[in-house]
């Protein structure tokens, strides 16, 4: 995700599920696809929802490590996919700077690439997406956050 993100955009499980179903609706008339490739780890949950909605049983992963919770590094392929991507649907949660998408596209150039969220820098690299967010926004996915007690506003003034 963008190193310079200044805003946060929290996404609930319900919102993610709704947006993944919306993505499936958009993809329904684009296929048929022979299989889904989830870009790990962020693409796993959206790919499962899209696979269910499109009644697809063949799901694989393209495993890439590009960042952790503190920094962005050079992308490393941990597990790739054979072939040029013909007939495949690539699913990821987000395209941000395009580093991961560019790497995956270079290995599967004929696949259809879909994400739930897209930022301006990476948007040209995906074929289908649901929601555009600004480049300076950090998306808080439900698998990255947990609920905790928040102090009342009056107590936070100190």
Annotated model-derived regions:
Residues 1-158:
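PRPP-associated nucleotide enzymes
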